[in-house]
Amino acid sequence: MKKKGLAMFALAAVMSLGAVGITAFAAGWSQEGSNWVYYNNNGSKVTNAWRQAQDGTWRYLESSGAMATNKWVDNDDYYVDASGIMITNKWLQVANSRKTSGYDWYYFGNNGKCSKEKWVQIDGKYYYFGDTGAMETGWILDDMYYCDDVGVMVTGWK
């Protein structure tokens, strides 16, 4: 009987030592230095993907796993602000990369995607956004339409 009890104790001790090597991992956000990263349930770092925060906002994780901030992401279709939050239902003014100076205006809909190559009605006015997503002004689309200096489509004769 004594040997059986000792064997059970030894078996329990071995089993508990094996359990020490198993690490439970909770998915979620973690700060690593100056960067925020997101881990899956299996402990792997999420990369090149969107993750939704508890407050409902969306953030993008770059190829390194770090949360992107203040930049274009996901094939330049989305923009995240200084807090890493996807811009939605907003205008954004960005330094113009096609000219030596100036700015371009972009509009992001409720899904956060930059409007590209289409007309968008905003507050009852129509704006056209070109292939880069920048708001167009002047004569556009083979000189068929005219958009004033603030991008609003002009209709009728003046």
PLM regions: where:
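Extracellular adhesion/carbohydrate-binding repeat motifs centered on closely spaced tryptophans
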Residues: 2-158
